[in-house]
């Protein structure tokens, strides 16, 4: 590129948040509902199921932290996917908590993974110490079997996060 520097978006949430702040959307009636559909790019070693360029459609609702708003976004996604005629869809929801309860869960998960280090894939034998959640996202058979028995984040939520998660579940039911 002749020494020029270019920036490729890795995902859509950060640019939406930047636009929200830059354009004074905090002064609008809340919540503010925004969406995007753009190409995004990853800078990592290619692996099965993960390409460097991909299209991402996203919805962001800013200004209302309620579980009902989370349910609204999930229902929007479900309706969209269903309208495409997709069959056999399954919805799984989870929570990794907040800055209060997540560190304890991350420590617990890290300890669990250390005990099963020899059973996880080679890539994650190196990575789990810095980001144990990545092991739970790995599609390799060895990591899938370890992940299936890993401690559940939902079982380690603080009271506020548990209340939010249960509120989301009851809204979706």
Region spans (language model):
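TRNA-recognition modules of translation machinery and tRNA-sensing kinases, especially anticodon-binding
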Residues: 1-173
């Amino acid at each position: 590129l002749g020494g020029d520097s270019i920036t490729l978006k890795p995902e859509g949430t950060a640019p939406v948040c930047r636009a929200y702040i830059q354009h004074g959307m905090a002064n609008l009636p809340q919540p503010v509902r925004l969406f995007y559909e753009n190409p995004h790019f990853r800078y990592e070693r290619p692996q099965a199921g993960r390409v460097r360029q991909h299209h991402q459609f996203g919805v962001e609702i800013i200004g209302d932290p309620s579980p009902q708003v989370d349910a609204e976004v999930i229902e929007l996604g479900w309706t969209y996917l269903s309208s495409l005629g997709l069959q056999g869809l399954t919805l799984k929801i989870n929570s990794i908590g907040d800055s209060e309860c997540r560190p304890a869960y991350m420590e617990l998960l890290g300890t669990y993974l250390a005990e099963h280090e020899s059973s996880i894939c080679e890539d994650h034998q190196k990575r789990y110490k810095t980001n144990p959640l990545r092991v739970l996202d790995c599609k390799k058979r060895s990591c899938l079997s370890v992940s299936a028995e890993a401690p559940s984040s939902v079982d380690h939520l603080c009271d506020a996060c548990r209340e939010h998660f249960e509120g989301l579940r009851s809204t979706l039911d």
